[in-house]
Design a protein with these regions (language model features):
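Short, hydrophobic/aliphatic alpha-helical segments
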Residues: 1-10
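Glycine-enriched loop-and-adjacent helix/strand subsegments that border the catalytic/binding cleft
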Residues: 9-214, 237-238, 261-269
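Glycine-rich beta-strand-to-loop/alpha-helix junction loops that act as flexible
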Residues: 17-19, 218-232
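Short, charged beta-turn/beta-strand-edge "cap" motif at the junction between a beta-strand
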Residues: 22, 228-233, 251-256
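Loop/turn positions that initiate beta-strands
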Residues: 219, 241-245
Length: 269
């Protein structure tokens, strides 16, 4: 297993993949946001930033935590949902200002926790509200081979919610990593192409992530949330409350190894 150090992650760039698991965007009420985004068949809709080291705006806030989710400071109720994902750690190979390739070396449990904000101009507006907006497990699986018959073929992702009244609920549908629409080299090649060519526009929720990476100083590493799985009926309709515990787990069916993330939810005050 590979230890994930938060201090080290402060220099990494963070971004996510939208629409990489069939049905998730519809469950999250976000499919309409992508009406002006062209995509090919089952391909994801695009990529979005959630952490830009050195950025002067909200994306420059370091959002990752191993053990808690801090609710945004708001006078009105905000609907927050766990987004159970695989976090993929990659080395970035640059050719000038262009990302030539991404080299994966570890993966594990990641919570791309999101505020459901209707009509948000960009996906990133739902993703980073400051400290402990996002969750990452303390340990990842060490993997460089993402081929369908490789070492990740036996890995699955699940998600549970422990509510403050002591109940435990299945929040995300237990899914194989090979269930992602794009995975392995197909996903890495697609992401690299998007980093080079996705420019974003006013009529879509997407942004020029590649340009943000260049502005961040050509980071040597990235943490990529490769997409949230489908929700259970309870997960689709249940939002996080102070006192809850969110659990995201990437586990092996061939051994007892697991990358597990447990985050206690608390208010900022």
């Amino acid at each position: 297993m590979f230890d994930i150090e938060l201090d080290e992650l402060r220099s990494w760039f963070g971004f996510g993949v939208a629409g990489n698991f069939a049905g998730h965007l519809e469950q999250a009420g976000e499919s309409a946001d992508f009406v002006n985004v062209a995509s090919n068949g089952v391909a994801p809709k695009g990529i979005f930033p959630w952490y830009v080291p050195g950025d002067d705006g909200f994306l420059g806030q370091f959002p990752l935590s191993h053990d808690e989710t801090v609710l945004p400071d708001s006078d009105t109720p905000l609907n927050l949902q766990i987004e159970p994902e695989v976090g993929l750690a990659c080395r970035v190979h640059w050719l000038g200002d262009v990302v030539a390739s991404l080299e994966p070396f570890a993966l594990g449990a990641f919570n791309d926790c999101s505020i459901r904000r209707p009509n948000a101009p960009k996906i990133s507006y739902k993703k980073n509200w400051g400290s402990a907006s996002k969750g990452v497990a303390q340990q990842f699986f060490e993997v460089s081979d993402l081929t369908p018959d490789g070492p990740t073929a036996t890995l699955r992702l699940n998600c549970h919610l422990h509510t403050s009244d002591g109940q435990e609920h299945e929040y995300g549908v237990d899914s194989p990593l090979l269930g992602y629409s794009y995975y392995g080299e197909v996903l890495l090649d697609w992401i690299t192409e998007r980093l080079d060519n996705q420019k974003g526009s006013a009529d879509t929720p997407l942004e020029d992530v590649g340009a943000l990476m260049v502005a961040a100083g050509h980071p040597a590493h990235v943490l990529i949330g490769i997409g949230a799985t489908k929700y259970t009926p309870l997960g689709e309709s249940t939002y996080l409350q102070a006192g809850d515990e969110a659990v995201v787990r990437v586990y092996s069916t061939a051994s007892d190894e697991a990358s597990e993330l447990r985050q206690r939810v608390r208010s900022v005050r």
